[in-house]
Amino acid sequence: MRTPRHGRRYAVAMAISGLAVLAAGCGTAGSTSSTAGTPALATPSGNPLAGLTADQIATKAEADLKAASSVHIAGPVTDSGQTYVLDLTLGPKGCTGTMAMPGKGSFLLLQIGKKLWFKGDRQFWKTSGGTSDPGLVTFLEGKYIEVSATSSDLSSFTTLCDPRKLASAFGGPASGLVKGTTTVISGQTVLQLKDSGDSSNAYVTISAHPEFVRIDGGRDGHLDFTAYNAPLRLTPPPASKTINGSQYGF
């Protein structure tokens, strides 16, 4: 998995334990929005961000992400030729959602505090779960595998799962960003923020309190940010459907 190099502000690392499920990306340009871009407004009229630098806007958006009680992120990301489709809702106490690998199945993820559960479908266990035993595949299908979220192997995932840690992973005070065009993504007018030291792009709402709408990695995929501060309920799976991951090498 690639690691962010200096200047690649919006590189986001996503990892899951020893399942060989890695996703890294989000930093490059691309005309992936729903309409053609227009030049960013240069005057304050109708644009509360016009008087701010790109770095100041990014800092405000990152602060809003840190303060969010929840946020939903979704999108495809690609690493080493493998595409993963993420659909996660994050909060300060944990997250829930799915990660899918086209042709290789999918699994549900749930983190609450120091505990993490994942539940793979049959295709996942057959192709990516590290077992070719049909009996074991049948046994594991539909079961929640419980592991410790504090394991060093899971540090990247626990960072992804918390809006505060995710925002902090962008690398400290914003610097070297420039304003790009205004465009429309998912019906929202947004402002593009470009990293002058790389090809990373972020898109934020044009408001007094800008929020990330998309981080775009071009060929590496993208992540869309929606449903800020929506109610998030995290409930442990039933004990009857849970097995201890350490018993199976997780």
List where the protein language model places each region:
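N-terminal mature ectodomain segment of secretory-pathway/periplasmic proteins
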Residues: 55-123, 202-203
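Extracellular/mature segments of secreted proteins
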Residues: 34, 168-170
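N-terminal leader/targeting segments and the immediate start of mature chains
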Residues: 2-85, 181-183, 239-250
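A short, amphipathic edge element
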Residues: 171-178
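Acidic/charged, solvent-exposed loop-and-adjacent secondary-structure segments enriched in E/D, K/R, S/T
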Residues: 119-166
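Gly/Pro-enriched, hydrophobic low-complexity segments
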Residues: 181-242
